[in-house]
UniProtKB/Swiss-Prot annotation:
Residues 225-250 are annotated as: Disordered. GO terms for biological process: translation. The lineage of its organism: Bacteria, Pseudomonadati, Chlorobiota, Chlorobiia, Chlorobiales. Disulfide bonds: none annotated. Residues 225-239 have a biased composition (Basic and acidic residues). The gene is rpsC. GO terms for cellular component: cytosolic small ribosomal subunit. This is Small ribosomal subunit protein uS3. Residues 240-250 have a biased composition (Basic residues). The keyword Magnesium does not apply. Pfam families: KH_2, Ribosomal_S3_C. It comes from Chlorobium phaeobacteroides (strain DSM 266 / SMG 266 / 2430).
Amino acid sequence: MGQKVNPNGFRLGIIRDWTSRWYDDSPVIAEKIKQDHVIRNYVQARLKREKAGIARIVIERTTKHIKINIYAARPGAVVGRKGEEINNLSQELSRITGKEVKIDVVEVIKPETEAQLIGENIAYQLENRVSFRRAMKQAIQQAMRAGAEGIRIRCAGRLGGAEIARAEQYKEGKIPLHTIRANVDYASVTAHTIAGTIGIKVWVYKGEVLVQRIDAIEEDELKRINERRGDSKSRPRDPRNKRRRRTKRS
């Protein structure tokens, strides 16, 4: 199952958090979800010209305002001179949403190991007629040098302008998709070339994460686990067992 499912969704609530962190049980929840989608598309398109390298966008909502955390490889391109770019972006999003928008920019320390940035970099090279093999191998080498424990890249489409579409992939290191505590970053990007669209999928393994959120497991589940293991503290001893043993010995 781990080979088919999205690795990000498979690890939600365990080692991966949601990109939309808010709760609403009103009938307008669908409109807010759609608004989050519009915000992400607008920010991506707006900052693509600046080549800021947006890894992910996290949206938090309150009753009065919307807080947007932008994880960027080049935070200076998002902020601009004296904060002009970020102020303009905040005002534009306020007009779209009708609420006050606060934007925080977080720097991505290792952009070479971010699956989204790797996919966008390969897509940019393919659109500029760079060999797909060269782009994939170069991205793998950069990721492994930056500290990734494993990476897999898969490109599908009319590679190299071929008449028949095909898929090719390159892999280095290990990608444990079934291990939930394994921090596997995943992204899917589309490159628009002259021959047609090329789908790019990237898996990056960054190591294991020790899950410290034991409170996520309910107490009754912990009791069941202890009972299965035969824990003496969770399972009281039956005094009749001693009597049976004594009768057998005698």
